[in-house]
From Swiss-Prot:
Belongs to the eIF-3 subunit J family. Component of the eukaryotic translation initiation factor 3 (eIF-3) complex, which is involved in protein synthesis of a specialized repertoire of mRNAs and, together with other initiation factors, stimulates binding of mRNA and methionyl-tRNAi to the 40S ribosome. The eIF-3 complex specifically targets and initiates translation of a subset of mRNAs involved in cell proliferation. Residues 1-64, 77-101 are annotated as: Disordered. GO terms for biological process: formation of cytoplasmic translation initiation complex. It comes from Nematostella vectensis. InterPro entries: eIF3-like_dom_sf, eIF3j. Its main location: cytoplasm. One of its GO terms (molecular function) is translation initiation factor activity. It is found in: Cytoplasm. It holds the Pfam family eIF3_subunit. This is Eukaryotic translation initiation factor 3 subunit J. Residues 43-108 form a coiled coil.
């Protein structure tokens, strides 16, 4: 006991590594969280910028810009043609006169077709293939309105040939082929429609003939009356003059 009193007790130092602070690392978490918030805000800003760009309507080109683009396109086309012409002229040196003539005609045809396409594009006219895709060939009618529109286009297309001598035989053959698969009742309806149309046309034709005859008769009657009057004036017209001389 005395020995303990004589000796001074000094507690050993606790290593710094062994001390654990329960609040240690809290500040670091806050820093990480703040950096995440910053990243989220940046992403939101980028998304908003993209949405704004997408929502912004595209500006329509002015007439000046359109003309400028067409002029540039024309210059590029002329440059391409000049280069192609130069290349072909170099190739012509190796051809015979007959081959040169045939090649010249071929190139002329290509140029004409190219010019035609440019003109059609300028005036907004489509090719025949495009017209067929947007006309009867492209239509698949299913409703009453669609069939009505289809009928108008078909009639407009067919009636262009009604003055041709083969038009009536064509209609007969076409109607026969169309009606082959129909029921008798449906064919009867079509026949009734044609009969009604025939009756209306006959009535109109008779009325037109009757009106023409009445007009012609009135003209002839009026002409006869005028003829008799002129004849009387010619026969007795001098009597009045003689009476005046006598007086």
């Amino acid at each position: 006991m005395a020995d303990w009193d004589d000796e001074k007790f000094e507690p050993g130092e606790v290593p710094a590594d062994g001390v654990t602070d329960k609040w240690e690392g809290e500040d670091e978490d806050d820093d990480i969280k703040e950096s995440w918030d910053d990243d989220d805000e940046d992403e939101k800003k980028e998304d908003e910028a993209k949405n704004t760009e997408a929502a912004a309507p595209k500006k329509k080109k002015t007439l000046k810009q359109i003309l400028k683009e067409k002029e540039e396109q024309k210059l590029l086309e002329e440059k391409r043609k000049a280069e192609e012409k130069q290349k072909l002229e170099e190739e012509d040196k190796e051809l015979t006169p007959e081959e040169q003539m045939a090649e010249k005609l071929r190139r002329q045809k290509i140029v004409e077709e190219s010019d035609l396409l440019v003109a059609m594009d300028t005036f907004g006219v489509g090719t025949q293939e495009e017209a067929s895709r947007t006309g009867l060939d492209s239509m698949i009618p299913s409703t009453k309105e669609e069939f009505t529109e289809y009928s108008k286009l078909l009639v407009e297309k067919l009636t262009k040939f009604e003055t041709n001598p083969e038009y009536i035989p064509f209609l007969e053959a076409t109607l026969r082929e169309i009606c082959v698969s129909l029921d008798p009742e449906d064919i009867k309806k079509l026949s009734s429609t044609l009969n009604m149309l025939q009756s209306e046309k006959l009535k109109a034709q008779k009325g037109k003939k009757a009106k023409s005859k009445a007009t012609k008769k009135a003209t002839l009657t009026g002409g006869a009356k005028m003829g008799r009057k002129d004849e009387m004036d010619y026969s007795y017209g001098d009597l009045g003059n003689e009476y005046d001389d006598f007086m």
